[in-house]
Amino acid sequence: MAVLLFYLWSPKIKKADLKTRAARTGLAVLSALAARFGVAALIRNFYPRERPFAFEGLDSLINQNPLEASFPSGHATFFMALAVYFLLSGQKKLGYFLLISAVLIGVARVAAGVHWPSDIMAGWAIGAAVSFVVFKLFSKSGWRN
């Protein structure tokens, strides 16, 4: 989130661009929240998969509830949604930074034993799809990204 705040209030941006950046950032966060707390949460209710560390009878490397479903990864969903929205809206530097972050977060969550690789890949797919839909909806409505 600190990256998004810096993106909004970078000393290099012109005051006229602030409104566009704020709207773009708002839509990116809306996409990420809808993907994570809407689509991913709904899927978790219908497909409650055990986390790897719980399945293997191990202790978690990070503080994670073993009873909470692992599929799909909420972290992967959220960060991929942000990355894809910014990439689609033409903010390549920020988009690629968030894309690399999404990949690193996904790898770290698998390494920590709190997600299966398929949890991460599903999260990435959901995040990308929701951001694509939100971007297209607002592009067609005449709102300029």
Regions found by a protein language model. Give the residues of each.
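Terminal transmembrane helix and immediately flanking juxtamembrane interfaces
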Residues: M1-A40, R44, I100, P117-N145
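Membrane-embedded catalytic cores of phosphoryl/pyrophosphoryl-handling enzymes
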Residues: I62-N145
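Membrane-interface loops
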Residues: K19-S89, A102
